[in-house]
Amino acid sequence: MTVQTLAIVVLLVSFFVMIFLRFPIAYAVGLSSVLCLMVQGQALSDVCRLMVKGISSFSLMAVPFFITMGVLMGSGGISEKLIALADACVGWMRGGMAMVNIVASYFFGGISGSASADTASIGSIMIPMMVDQGYDADFSTAVTITSSCEGLLVPPSHNMVIYATTAGGISVGSLFLAGYLPGALLAIVLMIGSYIISVKENYPKGSPFTIKGFIKQLGTSIWALAAVVIVVFGVVGGVFTATESAAIAVIYSLLVSVFVYKGLDWKGVWHALDECVNTLSIVLILIATSAVFGNCLTMLHVPDLAANAITSVTSNPYIIALLIDLIILVLGCIMDMAPIILIATPILLPIATSIGIDPIQFGIIMVLNCGIGLLTPPVGSVLFIGSAVAKRPMEKVVKATLPFYLCMFIALLLLTYVPDISLAIPKLLGGYVSPIANPLGPVFIH
């Protein structure tokens, strides 16, 4: 066995053993990288250098600001405003409260960018409300946790910033624009699934739609929705960078939460900032250790080996794309979102681009794949949060979620094989030019 082969075995085996032993993911990534470097005879001082280099990125400065913005808005009483707006839009439909839940998650996702925050904030309000109106508790929880994944796609999303930094050379603004249609697609397929179940179970309709009611609720929610406009259109319009827009959005969110909606006092602001620091410390140590892990993968030529392994199975690009989806889905069952993006992107992105998948399109595919993983045992953090909020056994929630897994997989396949769902808005509004000469799937906008 060569040193290269031994190092690869040590790196991957030690990593997955520590994952299954429930080591904190950052420790598993870091320790397996150290063992790999030791096998290769590398100086351990390289670990510190690579960790510092991994977090020394101007783009990554946006991550703490986006996390802070989401926590401030989520703690500032905004959830009720967005639920009321969603109710004015779609509450009149059969299974109206399920539809409201899904649309409210789309709105809230554009502010928090976090599936966990969406589940906790929207779920704590919507699940009891749905149960009171005759909806099954497990169905209500399933709708809540699956719709929370919209927030991962709708900008601003700090996971998209992490992907853009890891992939290299990708515009954060274009990636933000790319998330709107996929997020809407996911919402639509979930609404179709909810409608079918609601008709079968004879769940009630809400109040009739009125223009007056919609305008009233839009007026009360406009302050919250404006935060998204500041971030996305500020970046796309070239007014400021993603980091600058995130910093401005934090100040705006603080002012709106404290002085406009008055959902936060200064003590609440302190608690929100404390939560941000805790979350950020986890994210940054993970990014730092993943930089060492990624360096090990590159030195050992693991991306090339993975590409050769996949192409040895089939040369059909459509099947290779499906295999990539399945690999990320399996990883999502045992790992959280950020480490998958940090570790899998350097391996899978070159394979994806070689078969005609645009880097921005692949970012959207990666994020949705990871989102499905957040709902899947045994790791499934959003699944655990939803079960805890609803006080329902996890196995019953999983059973109720099965039809929605199918809906999400349909959305995933559409995003994989129809590039323009992800790329249409960046091309039309952001002037994005795809580097892929022969895209996988039909292209309608050039």
Residue ranges and their predicted role:
Residues 1-446:
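Alpha-helical transmembrane segments of multi-pass membrane transport proteins
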